[in-house]
Amino acid sequence: MLPPYFLFKEMTDTQYIGRFAPSPSGELHFGSLIAALGSYLQARARHGRWLVRIEDIDPPREVPGAAETILRQLEHYGLHWDGDVLWQSQRHHAYREALAWLHEQGLSYYCTCTRARIQSIGGIYDGHCRVLHHGPDNAAVRIRQQHPVTQFTDQLRGIIHADEKLAREDFIIHRRDGLFAYNLAVVVDDHFQGVSEIVRGADLIEPTVRQISLYQLFGWKVPDYIHLPLALNPQGAKLSKQNHAPALPKGDPRPVLIAALQFLGQQAEAHWQDFSVEQILQSAVKNWRLTAVPESAIVNSTFSNASC
């Protein structure tokens, strides 16, 4: 049985569709720009569409005004998206329908296990509540993992093998506190938007096999994946909002754009510094080479908090 019409979307359009999907937990930093720029260039080089989605489904982590700031930052750096911005906070009806369908098909169940219990058995959930028939009160919802995905092909990195225990785990798709889990929301929305290739940071390699397993449960076509190198500070830690990576500069965006292109292994034209933002991006699209992108790189202290 296929998912209901609202969820099932026959993908007849063969146009390339990419996306950038930040969470509004703070302003964009250099690491964020790498993900945005890489996904933008891959989409434009394929003559495709580039969408922006704001993943605002976790209010406790959100910073007031951050979403609007992120959109202004993208525009300031010349990264103009196609169509309307999709806000996950306006998509709860879709996630509820997805949860209902999975429950009706016997593909999910309620779980009352605490984090403390799961940590006490090694951190990987053991399926304790699978046959206990709990109700929804004070419970999370877990996927009933039947056909775990243990590997996938990354268009940049080749075949990536997942940790077997992690791949087989019945992971959470609706949290005990009532919030929708990232893995469910991202799959439902990427399918809804017709995303054909997901270009994002390498820190999201781990959940990819879980997301692919959800695509398969819903009977949807799985998109291609590219995981870009992470921008690291001089200490080898990923640039992130958690380690206080500085926000993108508000001044002339061109030096930062050029640094981001060089980080992605792209060949700099002789007079890039004399180009406008639009000219830099046009040239970058024309000369984009995914095969030149490195696996990882360290950025200089201009873009990282060297004290972290």
UniProtKB/Swiss-Prot annotation:
Motif placement: 'HIGH' region: 22-32
Cofactor: Zn(2+)
GO molecular function terms noted in the UniProt entry: ATP binding; glutamate-tRNA ligase activity; zinc ion binding
Residues holding ATP: 241
InterPro entries, alphabetized: Glu-Q_tRNA(Asp)_Synthase, Glu/Gln-tRNA-synth, Glu/Gln-tRNA-synth_Ib_cat-dom, GluQ/Sye, Rossmann-like_a/b/a_fold
GO BP annotations, alphabetical order: glutamyl-tRNA aminoacylation; tRNA modification
Keyword entries, A-Z: Aminoacyl-tRNA synthetase, ATP-binding, Ligase, Metal-binding, Nucleotide-binding, Zinc
Protein name: Glutamyl-Q tRNA(Asp) synthetase
